[in-house]
Amino acid sequence: YLIFLSVVAALGGFLFGYDTAVISGTIAQVTQLFQLDTLQQGWYVGCALIGSIVGVLFAGILSDKLGRKMTMIISATLFSTSALGCAISADFTQLVVYRIIGGVGIGVVSIVSPLYISEVAVAQYRGRLVSLYQLAVTVGFLGAYLINYQLLAYAESGNQLSMDWLNKIFVTEVWRGMLGMETLPAVLFFIIIFF
């Protein structure tokens, strides 16, 4: 059960890694679609860090007042909102706002998940279990790169999907699918926190 709790909390690290790395596959299409200049490109890539700062500043306060699990639930909600919002953004401003929301999730989870693991772990295994969080961050990076690669390969294959909205997300504007795919692990994180 201790390992399960640690893996659940470490899933927050996966989301941190995914959210941080997924942006790399989206820059070219987002730049073209919204006709971004280099300053706007930088803002698009870096705006999540603003949210991260906010998340880090409030993570300790939230976790002390609401508890570690409730704060991780808030983080999962922020990640889900960000991923879904990015996938359906109508303009650049909306996209940036949702990226900042995801950044808040990054900031919160980067404090609370390792803290939670260290509190539930017995001293004998604490170091190993807390390291699961960092491993999950790295796996999140890899996951984002693999998802980006697969979605881009599918989009470039010329295959079309039968529903227009799916076609838009996974073929014509595949960056939406890349950002939106984070919804799946975020919802999983949200659900399994309750166990």
Model regions: which residues?
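Transmembrane-helix signature of 12-pass secondary carriers
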Residues: 1-195
